[in-house]
Amino acid sequence: MNTLMRRACRRALFPGSFRLPALDPLNGTLMFSSGNACAAPVGCWAPPSGQDTGIKVYNSLTRKKEPLILADPTVATWYSCGPTVYDHAHLGHACSYVRFDTIRRILLKVFGIDIVMAMVVTDIDDKIIKRAKELNISPVALARTYEQDFKQDMTALRVLPPTVYMRVTESIPQIISFIQQIIANGHAYSTSQGNVYFDVQSIGDQYGKFNDSFCDAASESALQDKRHIRDFALWKTSKPEEPYWASPWGKGRPGWHIECSTIASSVFGKHLDIHTGGIDLAFPHHENEIAQCEAYHQSTQWGNYFLHTGHLHLKGNEEKMSKSLKNYVTIKEFLKSFSPDHLRMFCLRSKYKSAVEYSKESMHDAVNTLHLISSFVDDAKAYLKGQLICQPVQETLLWQRLNETKVNVKAAFSDDFDTPRAVDAVLDLIHHGNRQLKAVSKESSSPRSPIVYGAMVSYIEQFLEIMGISLGQNQVPAEERHSAMLFNVVEEMVSFRSKVRNYSLATNESATAIGQEEKQQYKERRRQLLLEREPLLQACDIARQHLAVYGINVKDRGDTSTWELLDRKEET
Protein backbone atom coordinates (compact mmCIF):
# COMPACT_ATOMS: atom_id res chain seq x y z
CA MET A 1 0.00 0.00 0.00
CA ASN A 2 1.55 3.36 -1.00
CA THR A 3 1.57 6.44 1.22
CA LEU A 4 -1.45 8.13 -0.41
CA MET A 5 -3.53 4.98 -0.10
CA ARG A 6 -2.53 4.62 3.55
CA ARG A 7 -3.55 8.20 4.30
CA ALA A 8 -6.88 7.80 2.54
CA CYS A 9 -7.53 4.53 4.33
CA ARG A 10 -6.64 6.04 7.67
CA ARG A 11 -8.99 8.99 7.13
CA ALA A 12 -11.78 6.57 6.23
CA LEU A 13 -11.24 4.55 9.39
CA PHE A 14 -10.58 7.37 11.85
CA PRO A 15 -11.92 10.64 10.39
CA GLY A 16 -10.57 13.79 12.02
CA SER A 17 -8.64 11.92 14.69
CA PHE A 18 -5.07 11.40 13.56
CA ARG A 19 -1.98 13.09 12.29
CA LEU A 20 0.80 11.20 10.59
CA PRO A 21 3.50 9.98 12.99
CA ALA A 22 6.42 12.36 13.28
CA LEU A 23 10.06 11.51 13.84
CA ASP A 24 11.48 12.54 17.19
CA PRO A 25 14.51 14.73 16.32
CA LEU A 26 16.29 13.69 19.52
CA ASN A 27 16.31 9.93 19.10
CA GLY A 28 14.80 9.10 15.72
CA THR A 29 11.79 7.27 17.19
CA LEU A 30 8.24 7.58 15.93
CA MET A 31 5.90 9.87 17.88
CA PHE A 32 2.16 9.18 17.69
CA SER A 33 -0.60 11.70 18.18
CA SER A 34 -4.36 11.40 18.27
CA GLY A 35 -7.52 13.27 19.01
CA ASN A 36 -9.01 10.14 20.56
CA ALA A 37 -8.97 10.49 24.35
CA CYS A 38 -8.11 6.85 24.90
CA ALA A 39 -5.21 7.03 22.49
CA ALA A 40 -3.59 9.72 24.61
CA PRO A 41 -0.98 8.53 27.12
CA VAL A 42 -3.05 9.65 30.12
CA GLY A 43 -5.74 7.40 31.54
CA CYS A 44 -5.29 4.28 29.41
CA TRP A 45 -2.44 2.59 31.24
CA ALA A 46 -2.00 1.90 34.93
CA PRO A 47 1.23 0.77 36.58
CA PRO A 48 0.87 -2.94 37.34
CA SER A 49 0.92 -4.31 40.87
CA GLY A 50 4.27 -5.61 42.01
CA GLN A 51 7.79 -4.45 42.73
CA ASP A 52 9.76 -1.76 40.93
CA THR A 53 12.89 -3.26 39.37
CA GLY A 54 14.65 0.11 39.20
CA ILE A 55 14.60 -0.05 35.39
CA LYS A 56 12.89 2.51 33.17
CA VAL A 57 11.52 1.28 29.84
CA TYR A 58 9.98 3.20 26.96
CA ASN A 59 6.43 1.87 26.85
CA SER A 60 4.77 2.34 23.46
CA LEU A 61 1.40 2.23 25.24
CA THR A 62 2.14 5.54 26.98
CA ARG A 63 4.77 6.96 24.60
CA LYS A 64 7.13 7.60 27.51
CA LYS A 65 9.47 5.86 29.92
CA GLU A 66 7.78 3.96 32.73
CA PRO A 67 9.17 2.05 35.72
CA LEU A 68 9.40 -1.68 34.98
CA ILE A 69 7.21 -3.24 37.66
CA LEU A 70 6.98 -7.02 37.94
CA ALA A 71 4.78 -9.19 40.15
CA ASP A 72 7.92 -11.19 40.93
CA PRO A 73 11.05 -9.01 40.52
CA THR A 74 13.09 -12.08 39.57
CA VAL A 75 10.87 -13.30 36.70
CA ALA A 76 9.39 -11.59 33.63
CA THR A 77 6.99 -13.04 31.06
CA TRP A 78 7.79 -12.01 27.49
CA TYR A 79 5.95 -12.63 24.24
CA SER A 80 7.80 -11.97 20.99
CA CYS A 81 6.29 -11.80 17.54
CA GLY A 82 8.24 -14.29 15.46
CA PRO A 83 8.87 -14.91 11.76
CA THR A 84 6.46 -15.62 8.94
CA VAL A 85 8.45 -18.42 7.35
CA TYR A 86 8.20 -18.09 3.58
CA ASP A 87 11.71 -16.85 2.70
CA HIS A 88 15.17 -16.17 4.14
CA ALA A 89 15.34 -13.72 7.03
CA HIS A 90 17.04 -10.42 6.20
CA LEU A 91 19.19 -7.93 8.07
CA GLY A 92 16.18 -5.90 9.22
CA HIS A 93 14.88 -8.97 11.03
CA ALA A 94 18.36 -9.67 12.40
CA CYS A 95 18.71 -6.19 13.91
CA SER A 96 15.34 -6.41 15.65
CA TYR A 97 16.04 -9.84 17.14
CA VAL A 98 19.61 -8.91 18.15
CA ARG A 99 18.40 -5.71 19.83
CA PHE A 100 15.78 -7.58 21.85
CA ASP A 101 18.29 -10.33 22.61
CA THR A 102 20.56 -7.65 24.08
CA ILE A 103 17.73 -6.41 26.30
CA ARG A 104 17.01 -9.97 27.39
CA ARG A 105 20.68 -10.52 28.28
CA ILE A 106 20.79 -7.27 30.26
CA LEU A 107 17.68 -8.20 32.25
CA LEU A 108 19.08 -11.65 33.00
CA LYS A 109 22.77 -10.98 33.56
CA VAL A 110 22.77 -7.45 34.99
CA PHE A 111 19.51 -7.34 36.93
CA GLY A 112 19.02 -11.04 37.69
CA ILE A 113 15.59 -11.27 36.06
CA ASP A 114 14.81 -14.66 34.54
CA ILE A 115 12.92 -14.42 31.26
CA VAL A 116 10.16 -16.80 30.23
CA MET A 117 9.78 -16.08 26.52
CA ALA A 118 7.35 -17.46 23.96
CA MET A 119 7.71 -16.79 20.23
CA VAL A 120 5.19 -17.62 17.54
CA VAL A 121 6.20 -19.10 14.20
CA THR A 122 3.60 -18.14 11.60
CA ASP A 123 3.62 -21.20 9.37
CA ILE A 124 0.33 -20.57 7.53
CA ASP A 125 -0.23 -17.25 5.81
CA ASP A 126 -1.16 -15.69 2.46
CA LYS A 127 2.52 -15.17 1.64
CA ILE A 128 3.37 -18.78 2.46
CA ILE A 129 0.53 -20.07 0.29
CA LYS A 130 1.53 -17.81 -2.61
CA ARG A 131 5.23 -18.75 -2.41
CA ALA A 132 4.44 -22.47 -2.14
CA LYS A 133 2.36 -22.27 -5.33
CA GLU A 134 5.23 -20.51 -7.12
CA LEU A 135 7.66 -23.25 -6.08
CA ASN A 136 5.12 -26.03 -6.61
CA ILE A 137 5.60 -27.44 -3.11
CA SER A 138 3.26 -27.78 -0.15
CA PRO A 139 2.90 -24.83 2.27
CA VAL A 140 3.95 -27.16 5.10
CA ALA A 141 7.20 -28.13 3.35
CA LEU A 142 7.98 -24.49 2.57
CA ALA A 143 7.26 -23.36 6.12
CA ARG A 144 9.35 -26.10 7.74
CA THR A 145 12.29 -25.32 5.45
CA TYR A 146 12.35 -21.62 6.27
CA GLU A 147 11.55 -22.16 9.95
CA GLN A 148 14.72 -24.21 10.23
CA ASP A 149 16.57 -21.62 8.17
CA PHE A 150 15.44 -18.86 10.56
CA LYS A 151 16.57 -20.81 13.62
CA GLN A 152 19.97 -21.44 12.02
CA ASP A 153 20.34 -17.71 11.35
CA MET A 154 19.48 -16.87 14.96
CA THR A 155 22.02 -19.42 16.21
CA ALA A 156 24.67 -17.93 13.92
CA LEU A 157 23.95 -14.48 15.38
CA ARG A 158 24.09 -15.89 18.93
CA VAL A 159 20.48 -14.86 19.63
CA LEU A 160 19.25 -16.82 22.64
CA PRO A 161 16.33 -19.07 21.69
CA PRO A 162 12.96 -18.41 23.32
CA THR A 163 11.85 -20.63 26.14
CA VAL A 164 9.33 -22.09 23.70
CA TYR A 165 8.57 -21.77 19.97
CA MET A 166 4.86 -22.12 19.11
CA ARG A 167 3.62 -22.93 15.59
CA VAL A 168 0.30 -21.55 14.44
CA THR A 169 -0.68 -24.80 12.70
CA GLU A 170 -0.23 -26.70 15.95
CA SER A 171 -2.53 -24.30 17.82
CA ILE A 172 -5.64 -24.38 15.60
CA PRO A 173 -7.96 -26.00 18.23
CA GLN A 174 -6.93 -23.35 20.78
CA ILE A 175 -7.48 -20.58 18.22
CA ILE A 176 -10.99 -21.82 17.42
CA SER A 177 -11.82 -21.99 21.14
CA PHE A 178 -10.40 -18.49 21.65
CA ILE A 179 -12.60 -17.11 18.86
CA GLN A 180 -15.68 -18.84 20.27
CA GLN A 181 -15.11 -17.17 23.64
CA ILE A 182 -14.75 -13.73 22.06
CA ILE A 183 -18.05 -14.31 20.24
CA ALA A 184 -19.66 -15.43 23.50
CA ASN A 185 -18.41 -12.27 25.20
CA GLY A 186 -20.15 -10.17 22.54
CA HIS A 187 -17.08 -8.86 20.70
CA ALA A 188 -17.11 -10.86 17.46
CA TYR A 189 -19.59 -12.17 14.92
CA SER A 190 -19.73 -14.76 12.16
CA THR A 191 -21.14 -14.24 8.67
CA SER A 192 -23.01 -16.36 6.18
CA GLN A 193 -19.83 -16.65 4.11
CA GLY A 194 -18.01 -18.45 6.92
CA ASN A 195 -15.88 -15.53 8.09
CA VAL A 196 -15.58 -14.32 11.68
CA TYR A 197 -14.81 -10.68 12.47
CA PHE A 198 -13.88 -8.77 15.58
CA ASP A 199 -16.46 -6.09 16.33
CA VAL A 200 -14.28 -3.04 16.97
CA GLN A 201 -17.22 -0.82 17.94
CA SER A 202 -18.12 -3.22 20.75
CA ILE A 203 -15.09 -2.16 22.81
CA GLY A 204 -15.51 1.59 22.27
CA ASP A 205 -12.57 3.72 23.41
CA GLN A 206 -10.58 0.65 24.39
CA TYR A 207 -9.56 0.44 20.73
CA GLY A 208 -6.87 2.90 19.66
CA LYS A 209 -3.91 2.33 21.97
CA PHE A 210 -1.56 2.46 18.97
CA ASN A 211 -2.23 4.66 15.97
CA ASP A 212 -0.36 4.79 12.70
CA SER A 213 -1.04 5.49 9.04
CA PHE A 214 -1.33 1.78 8.33
CA CYS A 215 -4.72 0.26 7.65
CA ASP A 216 -5.80 -3.35 7.87
CA ALA A 217 -8.76 -2.86 5.58
CA ALA A 218 -6.77 -3.00 2.36
CA SER A 219 -5.34 -6.42 3.16
CA GLU A 220 -8.87 -7.68 3.62
CA SER A 221 -10.45 -5.80 0.71
CA ALA A 222 -11.93 -9.04 -0.61
CA LEU A 223 -13.85 -9.58 2.62
CA GLN A 224 -16.98 -7.54 1.99
CA ASP A 225 -19.31 -9.15 4.52
CA LYS A 226 -18.20 -7.34 7.66
CA ARG A 227 -20.31 -4.78 9.49
CA HIS A 228 -17.77 -2.00 9.71
CA ILE A 229 -14.61 -1.23 7.76
CA ARG A 230 -12.53 -1.26 10.95
CA ASP A 231 -13.57 -4.81 11.85
CA PHE A 232 -10.83 -7.35 11.20
CA ALA A 233 -10.87 -11.07 10.49
CA LEU A 234 -10.49 -13.68 13.22
CA TRP A 235 -11.32 -16.57 10.90
CA LYS A 236 -11.27 -16.56 7.09
CA THR A 237 -13.20 -18.96 4.92
CA SER A 238 -10.94 -21.03 2.70
CA LYS A 239 -10.47 -20.42 -1.00
CA PRO A 240 -10.14 -23.21 -3.57
CA GLU A 241 -6.87 -25.16 -3.28
CA GLU A 242 -5.89 -23.42 -0.03
CA PRO A 243 -5.10 -25.23 3.23
CA TYR A 244 -8.03 -25.26 5.63
CA TRP A 245 -9.25 -26.56 8.98
CA ALA A 246 -12.75 -27.51 9.99
CA SER A 247 -14.47 -25.09 12.36
CA PRO A 248 -17.97 -24.23 13.62
CA TRP A 249 -18.11 -21.62 10.83
CA GLY A 250 -16.98 -23.92 8.04
CA LYS A 251 -13.65 -24.71 6.42
CA GLY A 252 -11.11 -21.95 6.85
CA ARG A 253 -7.98 -20.72 8.57
CA PRO A 254 -7.16 -18.16 11.27
CA GLY A 255 -6.60 -14.47 10.70
CA TRP A 256 -3.19 -12.97 11.36
CA HIS A 257 -3.83 -11.22 14.66
CA ILE A 258 -5.75 -13.97 16.44
CA GLU A 259 -2.76 -16.31 16.21
CA CYS A 260 -0.59 -14.22 18.53
CA SER A 261 -3.40 -13.46 20.99
CA THR A 262 -4.27 -17.13 21.36
CA ILE A 263 -0.72 -18.39 21.67
CA ALA A 264 0.36 -15.65 24.10
CA SER A 265 -2.71 -16.29 26.27
CA SER A 266 -2.23 -20.06 26.15
CA VAL A 267 1.27 -19.66 27.61
CA PHE A 268 0.90 -16.65 29.92
CA GLY A 269 -2.81 -16.40 30.70
CA LYS A 270 -4.56 -13.08 31.28
CA HIS A 271 -1.48 -11.05 32.23
CA LEU A 272 1.72 -10.41 30.26
CA ASP A 273 4.71 -8.37 31.36
CA ILE A 274 6.53 -7.60 28.10
CA HIS A 275 5.47 -7.75 24.45
CA THR A 276 7.96 -6.98 21.67
CA GLY A 277 8.15 -6.52 17.92
CA GLY A 278 9.16 -4.11 15.18
CA ILE A 279 7.58 -0.64 15.09
CA ASP A 280 5.64 -1.58 11.95
CA LEU A 281 3.71 -4.15 14.03
CA ALA A 282 2.37 -1.60 16.54
CA PHE A 283 -0.63 -0.87 14.32
CA PRO A 284 -2.65 -2.74 13.33
CA HIS A 285 -1.15 -6.01 14.59
CA HIS A 286 -0.44 -5.22 18.23
CA GLU A 287 -3.49 -2.97 18.43
CA ASN A 288 -5.67 -5.87 17.35
CA GLU A 289 -3.83 -8.34 19.58
CA ILE A 290 -4.64 -6.21 22.61
CA ALA A 291 -8.27 -5.83 21.56
CA GLN A 292 -8.69 -9.59 21.15
CA CYS A 293 -6.98 -10.48 24.44
CA GLU A 294 -8.87 -7.91 26.47
CA ALA A 295 -12.14 -9.02 24.85
CA TYR A 296 -11.33 -12.65 25.63
CA HIS A 297 -10.13 -12.08 29.22
CA GLN A 298 -12.64 -9.24 29.78
CA SER A 299 -9.89 -7.02 31.12
CA THR A 300 -8.65 -3.50 30.41
CA GLN A 301 -4.89 -4.09 30.53
CA TRP A 302 -3.64 -7.40 29.22
CA GLY A 303 -0.04 -6.48 28.35
CA ASN A 304 1.85 -4.09 30.60
CA TYR A 305 4.83 -3.05 28.46
CA PHE A 306 5.09 -2.93 24.68
CA LEU A 307 8.60 -2.41 23.29
CA HIS A 308 9.23 -1.75 19.61
CA THR A 309 12.45 -1.64 17.61
CA GLY A 310 13.08 0.99 14.96
CA HIS A 311 13.42 0.15 11.29
CA LEU A 312 16.66 -0.66 9.52
CA HIS A 313 17.06 1.11 6.19
CA LEU A 314 19.75 1.35 3.57
CA LYS A 315 21.74 4.56 3.19
CA GLY A 316 19.87 7.04 1.03
CA ASN A 317 16.61 5.09 1.31
CA GLU A 318 14.03 6.13 3.89
CA GLU A 319 11.94 2.99 3.37
CA LYS A 320 12.51 0.16 5.83
CA MET A 321 14.42 -2.90 4.66
CA SER A 322 11.79 -5.43 3.59
CA LYS A 323 11.22 -8.32 1.24
CA SER A 324 8.25 -6.66 -0.43
CA LEU A 325 10.37 -3.65 -1.43
CA LYS A 326 13.22 -5.92 -2.56
CA ASN A 327 15.76 -3.70 -0.81
CA TYR A 328 17.10 -6.24 1.63
CA VAL A 329 20.30 -8.09 2.49
CA THR A 330 19.83 -11.61 3.82
CA ILE A 331 21.52 -12.63 7.06
CA LYS A 332 23.54 -15.25 5.22
CA GLU A 333 24.78 -12.67 2.69
CA PHE A 334 25.76 -10.34 5.53
CA LEU A 335 27.73 -13.04 7.34
CA LYS A 336 29.88 -13.58 4.25
CA SER A 337 31.40 -10.14 4.84
CA PHE A 338 31.00 -9.54 8.57
CA SER A 339 30.91 -11.52 11.80
CA PRO A 340 28.05 -11.76 14.33
CA ASP A 341 30.11 -9.55 16.63
CA HIS A 342 30.16 -6.82 13.98
CA LEU A 343 26.36 -6.87 13.73
CA ARG A 344 25.98 -6.80 17.50
CA MET A 345 28.28 -3.80 17.85
CA PHE A 346 26.41 -2.11 14.97
CA CYS A 347 23.17 -2.58 16.93
CA LEU A 348 24.71 -1.43 20.22
CA ARG A 349 25.74 1.89 18.68
CA SER A 350 22.10 3.05 18.43
CA LYS A 351 19.11 2.92 20.78
CA TYR A 352 16.93 -0.11 20.17
CA LYS A 353 13.82 1.96 19.43
CA SER A 354 15.57 4.24 16.93
CA ALA A 355 15.64 3.85 13.18
CA VAL A 356 19.13 2.87 12.05
CA GLU A 357 20.96 3.26 8.75
CA TYR A 358 22.91 0.35 7.29
CA SER A 359 25.85 1.62 5.29
CA LYS A 360 29.51 1.04 4.64
CA GLU A 361 30.30 3.84 7.08
CA SER A 362 28.13 2.51 9.91
CA MET A 363 29.62 -0.96 9.59
CA HIS A 364 33.12 0.54 9.45
CA ASP A 365 32.38 2.24 12.78
CA ALA A 366 31.25 -1.07 14.30
CA VAL A 367 34.33 -2.92 13.02
CA ASN A 368 36.69 -0.20 14.24
CA THR A 369 35.03 -0.06 17.66
CA LEU A 370 35.47 -3.80 18.13
CA HIS A 371 39.08 -3.59 16.96
CA LEU A 372 39.77 -0.76 19.42
CA ILE A 373 38.40 -2.84 22.29
CA SER A 374 40.23 -5.98 21.17
CA SER A 375 43.54 -4.12 20.82
CA PHE A 376 43.27 -2.67 24.31
CA VAL A 377 42.53 -6.10 25.79
CA ASP A 378 45.56 -7.55 23.98
CA ASP A 379 47.83 -4.70 25.12
CA ALA A 380 46.60 -4.92 28.70
CA LYS A 381 47.24 -8.67 28.75
CA ALA A 382 50.72 -8.08 27.31
CA TYR A 383 51.34 -5.65 30.18
CA LEU A 384 50.08 -8.26 32.65
CA LYS A 385 52.54 -10.81 31.24
CA GLY A 386 55.41 -8.35 31.41
CA GLN A 387 55.73 -8.29 27.62
CA LEU A 388 54.87 -4.59 27.40
CA ILE A 389 57.22 -2.22 29.23
CA CYS A 390 55.49 1.04 30.15
CA GLN A 391 55.99 4.20 32.10
CA PRO A 392 54.75 4.15 35.73
CA VAL A 393 50.96 3.79 35.85
CA GLN A 394 48.66 6.10 37.83
CA GLU A 395 46.94 3.17 39.49
CA THR A 396 44.61 5.16 41.76
CA LEU A 397 43.23 7.09 38.78
CA LEU A 398 42.53 3.90 36.83
CA TRP A 399 40.74 2.27 39.76
CA GLN A 400 38.59 5.39 40.02
CA ARG A 401 37.82 5.30 36.29
CA LEU A 402 36.92 1.62 36.45
CA ASN A 403 34.49 2.12 39.34
CA GLU A 404 32.91 5.12 37.58
CA THR A 405 32.49 3.04 34.43
CA LYS A 406 30.67 0.29 36.30
CA VAL A 407 28.25 2.84 37.78
CA ASN A 408 27.72 4.60 34.44
CA VAL A 409 27.12 1.38 32.51
CA LYS A 410 24.51 0.12 34.97
CA ALA A 411 22.82 3.53 34.96
CA ALA A 412 22.68 3.40 31.16
CA PHE A 413 21.18 -0.09 31.23
CA SER A 414 18.62 1.06 33.81
CA ASP A 415 17.59 3.92 31.53
CA ASP A 416 15.67 2.04 28.82
CA PHE A 417 18.65 -0.18 27.97
CA ASP A 418 20.73 2.71 26.61
CA THR A 419 23.47 0.67 24.94
CA PRO A 420 25.13 3.59 23.08
CA ARG A 421 25.77 5.31 26.42
CA ALA A 422 27.03 2.06 27.94
CA VAL A 423 29.46 1.44 25.06
CA ASP A 424 30.69 5.04 25.26
CA ALA A 425 31.40 4.56 28.98
CA VAL A 426 33.50 1.47 28.23
CA LEU A 427 35.33 3.25 25.40
CA ASP A 428 36.12 6.13 27.76
CA LEU A 429 37.64 3.64 30.21
CA ILE A 430 39.73 2.18 27.39
CA HIS A 431 40.86 5.67 26.41
CA HIS A 432 42.22 6.31 29.90
CA GLY A 433 43.77 2.85 30.01
CA ASN A 434 45.52 3.33 26.67
CA ARG A 435 46.94 6.70 27.72
CA GLN A 436 49.05 4.95 30.34
CA LEU A 437 50.06 1.93 28.26
CA LYS A 438 52.81 3.81 26.48
CA ALA A 439 55.76 1.61 25.65
CA VAL A 440 59.24 2.71 26.76
CA SER A 441 62.62 1.23 25.87
CA LYS A 442 63.79 0.68 29.45
CA GLU A 443 61.78 -0.56 32.41
CA SER A 444 61.35 1.92 35.25
CA SER A 445 62.46 1.14 38.76
CA SER A 446 58.92 2.03 39.91
CA PRO A 447 56.65 -0.92 40.75
CA ARG A 448 54.35 -2.22 38.01
CA SER A 449 50.53 -2.12 38.35
CA PRO A 450 49.20 -5.22 36.61
CA ILE A 451 46.25 -5.80 38.95
CA VAL A 452 44.26 -2.75 37.88
CA TYR A 453 44.69 -3.69 34.22
CA GLY A 454 43.62 -7.22 35.02
CA ALA A 455 40.47 -5.85 36.65
CA MET A 456 39.79 -3.63 33.63
CA VAL A 457 40.18 -6.53 31.21
CA SER A 458 37.94 -8.72 33.35
CA TYR A 459 35.20 -6.07 33.42
CA ILE A 460 35.40 -5.34 29.68
CA GLU A 461 35.24 -9.03 28.81
CA GLN A 462 32.27 -9.43 31.15
CA PHE A 463 30.55 -6.46 29.49
CA LEU A 464 31.10 -7.96 26.04
CA GLU A 465 29.83 -11.35 27.19
CA ILE A 466 26.62 -9.73 28.45
CA MET A 467 26.24 -8.05 25.05
CA GLY A 468 26.66 -11.39 23.30
CA ILE A 469 30.06 -10.44 21.89
CA SER A 470 32.91 -12.91 22.17
CA LEU A 471 36.41 -11.68 21.38
CA GLY A 472 39.17 -14.12 20.52
CA GLN A 473 38.52 -17.49 18.96
CA ASN A 474 34.73 -17.16 18.96
CA GLN A 475 35.01 -14.05 16.79
CA VAL A 476 36.72 -16.09 14.09
CA PRO A 477 34.60 -18.46 11.95
CA ALA A 478 34.75 -22.05 13.18
CA GLU A 479 36.63 -23.37 10.16
CA GLU A 480 39.39 -20.82 10.74
CA ARG A 481 39.91 -21.30 14.47
CA HIS A 482 43.47 -22.24 15.31
CA SER A 483 44.20 -25.51 17.04
CA ALA A 484 46.47 -25.84 20.05
CA MET A 485 49.22 -27.08 17.74
CA LEU A 486 48.89 -24.09 15.42
CA PHE A 487 48.94 -21.79 18.43
CA ASN A 488 52.27 -23.25 19.54
CA VAL A 489 53.71 -23.03 16.03
CA VAL A 490 52.83 -19.34 15.77
CA GLU A 491 54.15 -18.71 19.27
CA GLU A 492 57.51 -20.26 18.35
CA MET A 493 57.58 -18.41 15.03
CA VAL A 494 56.97 -15.02 16.66
CA SER A 495 59.52 -15.75 19.38
CA PHE A 496 62.16 -16.70 16.80
CA ARG A 497 61.40 -13.61 14.73
CA SER A 498 61.72 -11.44 17.85
CA LYS A 499 65.20 -12.82 18.55
CA VAL A 500 66.29 -12.23 14.96
CA ARG A 501 64.88 -8.70 15.06
CA ASN A 502 66.73 -7.86 18.29
CA TYR A 503 69.94 -9.20 16.77
CA SER A 504 69.33 -7.07 13.66
CA LEU A 505 68.83 -3.90 15.72
CA ALA A 506 72.14 -4.56 17.51
CA THR A 507 71.32 -2.40 20.51
CA ASN A 508 72.65 -4.59 23.31
CA GLU A 509 75.33 -6.30 21.24
CA SER A 510 76.93 -3.10 20.02
CA ALA A 511 77.09 -1.73 23.54
CA THR A 512 78.80 -4.90 24.73
CA ALA A 513 81.23 -4.98 21.82
CA ILE A 514 82.65 -1.49 22.25
CA GLY A 515 83.09 -1.60 26.02
CA GLN A 516 84.53 1.75 27.10
CA GLU A 517 85.10 3.23 23.68
CA GLU A 518 84.17 6.79 23.01
CA LYS A 519 80.59 7.80 22.16
CA GLN A 520 81.43 8.49 18.52
CA GLN A 521 83.03 5.09 18.13
CA TYR A 522 79.90 3.52 19.66
CA LYS A 523 77.65 5.20 17.10
CA GLU A 524 79.89 4.19 14.23
CA ARG A 525 80.07 0.59 15.38
CA ARG A 526 76.26 0.36 15.68
CA ARG A 527 75.77 1.94 12.27
CA GLN A 528 78.01 -0.70 10.72
CA LEU A 529 76.13 -3.50 12.47
CA LEU A 530 72.78 -2.12 11.30
CA LEU A 531 74.00 -1.98 7.70
CA GLU A 532 75.33 -5.52 7.86
CA ARG A 533 72.13 -6.88 9.37
CA GLU A 534 69.60 -4.82 7.43
CA PRO A 535 68.56 -7.81 5.27
CA LEU A 536 67.61 -9.67 8.45
CA LEU A 537 65.48 -6.74 9.63
CA GLN A 538 63.78 -6.58 6.23
CA ALA A 539 63.10 -10.31 6.44
CA CYS A 540 61.45 -9.77 9.83
CA ASP A 541 59.18 -7.10 8.33
CA ILE A 542 58.28 -9.36 5.41
CA ALA A 543 57.50 -12.23 7.80
CA ARG A 544 55.16 -9.96 9.75
CA GLN A 545 53.40 -8.90 6.52
CA HIS A 546 52.99 -12.50 5.40
CA LEU A 547 51.56 -13.53 8.77
CA ALA A 548 49.08 -10.64 8.57
CA VAL A 549 47.65 -12.14 5.38
CA TYR A 550 46.54 -15.12 7.47
CA GLY A 551 45.04 -12.94 10.18
CA ILE A 552 48.05 -13.06 12.52
CA ASN A 553 48.88 -9.56 13.72
CA VAL A 554 52.42 -9.27 15.17
CA LYS A 555 53.15 -6.31 17.44
CA ASP A 556 56.74 -5.32 18.22
CA ARG A 557 57.07 -3.90 21.73
CA GLY A 558 60.62 -2.79 22.43
CA ASP A 559 62.71 -5.94 22.68
CA THR A 560 59.68 -8.29 22.78
CA SER A 561 56.94 -9.18 20.31
CA THR A 562 53.35 -10.34 20.81
CA TRP A 563 50.68 -11.53 18.41
CA GLU A 564 46.91 -11.80 18.06
CA LEU A 565 44.60 -13.67 15.72
CA LEU A 566 42.22 -11.29 13.95
CA ASP A 567 38.97 -11.92 12.13
CA ARG A 568 39.89 -11.28 8.51
CA LYS A 569 36.35 -9.97 7.92
CA GLU A 570 37.46 -6.80 9.69
CA GLU A 571 39.37 -5.91 6.55
CA THR A 572 36.24 -5.80 4.36
Curated annotation (Swiss-Prot):
Xref: Gene3D superfamilies: Cysteine-tRNA ligase, C-terminal anti-codon recognition domain (1.20.120.1910), HUPs (3.40.50.620)
GO molecular function: ATP binding; cysteine-tRNA ligase activity; metal ion binding
Sorted UniProt keywords: Aminoacyl-tRNA synthetase, ATP-binding, Ligase, Metal-binding, Mitochondrion, Nucleotide-binding, Protein biosynthesis, Transit peptide, Zinc
UniProt: L-cysteine binding residues: G82, T122, H285
Motif ('KMSKS' region): 320-324
Protein function: Mitochondrial cysteine-specific aminoacyl-tRNA synthetase that catalyzes the ATP-dependent ligation of cysteine to tRNA(Cys). In addition to its role as an aminoacyl-tRNA synthetase, has also cysteine persulfide synthase activity. Produces reactive persulfide species such as cysteine persulfide (CysSSH) from substrate cysteine and mediate direct incorporation of CysSSH into proteins during translations, resulting in protein persulfides and polysulfides. CysSSHs behave as potent antioxidants and cellular protectants.
Domain commentary: 'KIIK' region and 'KMSKS' region are required for cysteine persulfide synthase activity.
Protein known as: Probable cysteine--tRNA ligase, mitochondrial
Originating species: Xenopus laevis (African clawed frog)
